[in-house]
Amino acid sequence: MVLTDAEELRSPVITSDMSFFDLESNHSSDSVHLLCEKYTHKLPIESESQTTFRLAPTKQRLYRQSTLYVPLSLKQRVFLFTERVKSIWAGLPRCKPNKYFKVAFALAVLTPLAIWIFYIDFRVH
């Protein structure tokens, strides 16, 4: 992909991004061109900043999913799980369960899970 002088002056990000691809080593020229076509449309527009590229919240979520984002701690995993459960409960306006149903559901799911984990831990170790 060859840029003219006017294009290079107008979009320095594209020229700097293209310099990272090494045509000789790992990528054939076809794969480099495919990568260029795939990622050049995601670069900043002239009205945006030329030096920084900010992701929208939905793009951040897609980026995390595509890069196998794994939360680092148990606390983060529990927080993300409870947020998902709360969003599911909030999305069901007709069947708003009362607190007794929630407790019964939690006990019905967590008790066998705890027993199974204890059994596996006891039998393996």
Curated annotation (Swiss-Prot):
Cellular component, GO, one term: membrane
Q: What is this protein called?
A: Putative uncharacterized protein YCL021W-A
Topology of this chain in the membrane: Single-pass membrane protein
Q: Source organism's superkingdom?
A: Eukaryota
Task: List the subcellular locations.
Answer: Membrane
Keywords (alphabetical) are: Membrane, Transmembrane, Transmembrane helix
Which chain regions cross the lipid bilayer?
100-120
Identify the species of origin. Answer: Saccharomyces cerevisiae (strain ATCC 204508 / S288c)
Primary location class: membrane
